[in-house]
Amino acid sequence: MIHFGQLALDGSPRIAVPFRDGNDPASIARALELGMDIAELRIDQFANRNTAHVLREIEKFQGVPILATVRSATEGGAWPDSDTARLELYRAILPQVDAVDVEWSSSSIATHVVSAARALAKPVVLSFHDFT
């Protein structure tokens, strides 16, 4: 069975809520009250993508299963920097999150992200989006 932190993905539906940065504890608590199972941190959409800032934002979700996503513009996201910088960020945050989402078409980083996640026994959501 796959786990996102302590949350077992047992085949029952789960609710993932996307977040950008700048959330206060009350908004996170409200999402939990409304049934959120997983917080998807859309790091590509953060106003500040500095690693230290991202790690501080992750800390706000302590005790909540976290799926980290960093999509490039070609993947429908907002990451403005290089794939090398994106890979470095994934590697820096992997120990602090419960799972990562990487686009299948991210050929320059996908295998590296998957390998880094596997080394830490973290699940990977390997996404595919067709924008044609």
Go through each PLM region and give its residues.
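Short amphipathic alpha-helical segments and helix-helix/interface helices
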Residues: A29, L55-I58, Y90-R91, A110-S115
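Catalytic beta/alpha-barrel core
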Residues: P18-R20, I38-N48, T69, R86, ...
